[in-house]
Amino acid sequence: MTEDLFGDLQDDTILAHLDNPAEDTSRFPALLAELNDLLRGELSRLGVDPAHSLEIVVAICKHLGGGQVYIPRGQALDSLIRDLRIWNDFNGRNVSELTTRYGVTFNTVYKAIRRMRRLKYRQYQPSLL
């Protein structure tokens, strides 16, 4: 009942289009070195011992390694940072103060709080599907 459906197929031309895995892994040490250098500079700028940069790189690799990660920049990054700051400063009764401090509308503050609550909720409550 079992038949080899592709027994006569010997066309290996598709293999010529595959990337060389050895070439792919060569860029990762350079990326990690660049990340380490960036962290050393930022830690020094903040007055923290730059020797901790490698520990941070290792922690990032252990947490995010093996997966695809989107790192925002530009307006998306600015909005996310603003929302995080609003969330950190929010105490449940200071929405009006936050609108003034960050120069945004009430609606923007409420959206930021809702967004951060959703992210925190997902962090602690994984999807069941």
Curated annotation (Swiss-Prot):
Superkingdom to which the source organism belongs: Viruses
Swiss-Prot/TrEMBL keywords: Activator, DNA-binding, Early protein, Host cytoplasm, Transcription, Transcription regulation
Region feature Dimerization, mapped onto this chain: 28-64
Region DNA-binding, residue ranges: 77-129
Subcellular location, principal: host cell
Keyword Protein biosynthesis: no
GO molecular function, one term: DNA binding
Annotated Gene Ontology cellular component terms: host cell cytoplasm
Subunit structure: Homodimer.
Family: Belongs to the c/mor transcriptional regulatory family.
Function text: Activator of the Pm promoter, which controls middle genes expression. Activation of Pm allows expression of protein C necessary for late gene expression. In addition to Mor binding, activation of Pm might require the interaction of Mor with the C-terminus of host RNAP subunits RpoA and RpoH.
Protein name: Middle operon regulator
Provenance organism: Escherichia phage Mu
